[in-house]
UniProtKB/Swiss-Prot annotation:
The gene is GOLGA2P5. Belongs to the GOLGA2 family. Residues 110-131 have a biased composition (Gly residues). This is Putative golgin subfamily A member 2B. Residues 1-20, 95-132 are annotated as: Disordered.
Length: 144
């Protein structure tokens, strides 16, 4: 037992100035961490507000002379989007925000007979560009 007591050497107590310096360093670190977390939270809240605002946007086709001819909401084909398109869809469609509302252009104004054209992921330009376009885009679909 005496040999065990001899092996245990008490650790020296840190001096008070060292404790104060480490405490000040920790306080400064945590204050910095809190400030950066608050900035990140404010940035994310701004993105959320932007997303929410864009979800309520309504896109209308070119103005019509008679307001009674404005399309009904079911004609707009509201389709929630899971992400931002990597490039704009081409064809007779317009979209806005992260929630896309498909709006066909007036007949005769669209090239290609009013077919939605978008290359799918992993497809090159050319023959695969229009193939399965409504499915490949995944964000906009033609409203029948």
């Amino acid at each position: 037992m005496d040999s065990e007591e001899e092996e245990e050497v008490p650790q020296p107590m840190p001096s008070i100035p060292e404790d104060l310096e480490s405490q000040k360093a920790m306080v400064a670190f945590f204050n910095s961490a809190v400030a950066s977390a608050e900035e990140e939270q404010a940035r994310l809240c701004g993105q959320l507000k932007e997303c929410t605002a864009s979800a309520w946007l309504i896109c209308w086709p070119r103005p019509r002379r008679n307001l009674r001819q404005q399309p009904q909401p079911q004609e707009l084909g509201v389709i929630p989007c899971v992400g931002r398109p990597t490039r704009p869809c081409r064809g007779p469609w317009r979209s806005c925000g992260r929630v896309h509302r498909t709006v066909p252009e007036p007949e005769g104004s669209a090239e290609g007979g009013g077919v939605h054209q978008q290359a799918g992921p992993g497809q090159g330009r050319g023959e695969g560009e229009a193939a399965g376009a409504g499915v490949a885009c995944g964000r906009l679909q033609q409203v029948a």
